[in-house]
Structure formats: C-alpha cells, structure tokens
C-alpha cells in the first residue's frame, strides 16, 4: 500500500469506521475503533462530530477509499479516469478495478492478513499468477487466472495465521479459494454488490472528480 506518514489506526479513526488496514488486529478488541471510537487529536474525544455535506462529504468518501486500497492521489485519479472511459457506471467500474488489484486479491484470498501485507508479498516476488512471478501490486487480475504463493512461503508464520483467520470470514463469490494449497482462481470479474466492507458510496467520488 502507498506509504502514509500518519499511524495506520488513526486513519480508521479519522473515517469513523474500520478500513481493515491493520490485518488481524482489526478483528480483536485491540482495534483502535473498538478502544477509541472518536477522531484523533488532542480534543478528539470532546469534539462534536461535524455533519458533512456537499464537498466535505465527497472528500471524506474519496479519502476513505484511497486509504482502504492504499493509494496516493495520482494513482487514484488515474483509476477514476480509466473508470470514466470504460463502459458502464463510472463508480461501479472504479470499485471493480480496485478489487482486481493483485495486492487486494492476495488479501481477499486469505493469503495475507491485510492489503498492506499482500502488497509486500507481491513486491518481494512471493506471488505467482498462472505460475509466473508478478511483482506489480497494481496488476489487474482477469477471470481464469490462478494466484498462488511460492512454496517457500507456505510455512511462513504470518501467512499461516492469515489463512487460519480467513477460514472464519465470508467467502468471496468471484474467487475459488484453495486454502490447503495457498492459491485462488479468479472465476469471474468482481461485482459491485459483492464489495461490502467498508461501506462505500462511490457516486460521491464520481461527483467530486466531475467538477
């Protein structure tokens, strides 16, 4: 994921909801949202929540999605522009494209505990697509492609822990996951209705960039 100078858990608190950036910690009582569900800062606990509207609401939605997928502004704008040129609703195109990123698919497959960890696995050359090394986190997967971890990583403690936790999570309809062999096959393109966490109102982002 793109580097953020701000502490990861503060990003979730800023958005007021879990973005699942911290991996396994997000599923425990140690999660910052569970412990301190108020905006970060010296007066965060006593500060009244502002009711956002218009531009403020659009901006917050954009920031939430950027942080969820770990993107910088230039990268995110590029995805928006590509989504505008593609057939179909721009907002849906955007979310589907982000879901197809290889680092996200590694996470969705339960091979990593977070998108950030998935990105590191990709960058370090541990991920294979159809048996060939791909070290580009932004690589967009397509139906029939198989994503796997190289055998050396099958006994990695972080990978094993991520796999065990993923077994209790909901399935991903567009992925056929083989946890025993540390791989997954893309059986279809992701659909917008399959992406539920965090809640995203992508039309607000489309409106923001259309100005």
Residue ranges with predicted function:
Residues 1-109, 135-211:
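Ferredoxin-like alpha/beta domains used as RNA- or RNAP-binding modules
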Residues 108, 112-117:
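Internal active-site segments that recognize and position negatively charged phosphoryl groups
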Residues 115, 121-122, 141:
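Short, well-ordered loop/turn sites that connect or cap secondary structure elements
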Residues 108, 123-124:
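Short, intrinsically disordered, mixed-charge
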Residues 120, 126, 144-146:
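Residue-level marker of beta-strand positions
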Residues 125-129, 133-135:
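Glycine- and Gly-Pro-enriched alpha-helical subdomains that act as flexible
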């Amino acid at each position: 994921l793109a580097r953020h100078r701000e502490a990861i858990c503060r990003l979730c608190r800023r958005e007021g909801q879990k973005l699942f950036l911290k991996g396994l910690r997000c599923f425990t009582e140690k999660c910052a949202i569970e412990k301190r569900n108020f905006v970060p800062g010296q007066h965060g606990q006593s500060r009244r929540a502002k009711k956002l509207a218009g531009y403020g609401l659009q901006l917050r939605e954009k920031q939430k999605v950027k942080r969820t997928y770990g993107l910088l502004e230039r990268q995110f704008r590029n995805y928006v522009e590509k989504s505008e040129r593609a057939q179909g609703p721009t907002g849906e195109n955007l979310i589907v494209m982000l879901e197809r990123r290889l680092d996200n698919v590694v996470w969705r497959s339960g091979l990593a505990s977070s998108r950030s960890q998935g990105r590191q696995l990709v960058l370090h050359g541990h991920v294979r697509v159809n048996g060939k090394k791909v070290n580009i986190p932004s690589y967009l997967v397509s139906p029939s492609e198989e994503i796997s971890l190289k055998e050396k990583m099958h006994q990695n403690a972080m990978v094993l822990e991520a796999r065990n936790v993923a077994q209790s999570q909901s399935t991903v309809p567009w992925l056929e996951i083989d946890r025993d062999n540390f791989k997954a096959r893309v059986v279809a393109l992701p659909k917008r209705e399959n992406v539920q966490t965090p809640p995203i109102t992508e039309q607000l982002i489309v409106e923001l960039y259309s100005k």
